[in-house]
Amino acid sequence: MIKNVAYFPLQCALNSGPVMSAVLDCLQSRGIQTQENSMTSDAAVIWSVLWHGRMSANRQVYEHYRAQGKPVIIIEIGALYRGNTWKISVNNITSHGYYGHLDNLDWDRPKKLNISLATQLVSKPNVIIAVQHDRSLQVAGVNMSDWVKNTISTLRNNTDRPITIRPHPRCRLMLNNLPSGVSIESPKKLANTYDSYDMHFDCHAVVNYNSGPGIQAAIAGSRPIVHSTSLAHPVGVGFADIEQPYITNRDLWLTQISHTEYTLNELEQGLWLNRIHPAL
């Protein structure tokens, strides 16, 4: 088990204060020292793997610690209950990260988080392509504009449904001369939120590389078409099955995925640390 953890207060989102404090207080309560701006600790905790804005410098921290084989604890805004739950993982926030979410499950956890599965009875005909920020570790090596173009082509080989492109709200796409039947929908910020945007899952399917919309689509009952590194991949469908009924059993998956995110009170209590400690 690690003895100390580095943290970097100036490299966090402006709304991170209570969440980061809860994590640091929990570590200290377990006898783990927290060291500000240290590059020599046993591990590091960083806010997000989006190398952009205030968090740009986290990339240097991440690469420095990983190059030494040291774990990096990542805090990320949650996909289950955005603004109320927070994702905690080790080394990545895709399926390549460690969450400790596959075993020793609390089967009542989805209910505790007020999360339940929906089944679509009627949906709009369109397919949404939910694009990610190109500066995120999640899509390292992936050109998002090229990915969108290739996704459109693959969709057209499997369906004639209208396609709606949803860009990441803080990342511009270079998309010109879109084919007919393809439109762009600009995200709209929700009032009285820090950084939440409108997103509706009353569509036929959602194509997403490996971020929150894939998870949210699966919960909402909209077919998620995702990369193998997505946490939604176990309940995803392939492009070739886009016109088939979405009847995948999602019960186990929902319980498992609900063990990847925590409320502020749970961060203080240390449920997350109990889960990830084998990776530290």
Please annotate each region the language model reported.
Residues M1-S48, S136, L280:
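N-terminal pre-catalytic "stem/leader" segment of glycosyltransferase-like enzymes
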Residues F8-C12, K149-N192:
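Catalytic donor nucleotide-activated moiety binding site of glycosyltransferases and closely related
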Residues F8-L10, W47-V49, I75-A79, K124-S136, ...:
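Short loop/turn segments at strand-loop or loop-helix junctions that form parts
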Residues S16-L24, R54-Q60, N143-T154:
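Well-ordered, non-membrane alpha-helical segments in soluble/globular domains
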Residues Q33-D42, K188-M199:
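Short acidic low-complexity segments
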Residues E36-R66, V206-Y209:
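Short, well-ordered secondary-structure micro-motifs within conserved domains or adaptor modules
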Residues T85-K124, P234-L280:
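Leloir-type glycosyltransferase catalytic cores
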Residues N192-F239:
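A donor-sugar binding/catalytic signature common to diverse glycosyltransferases
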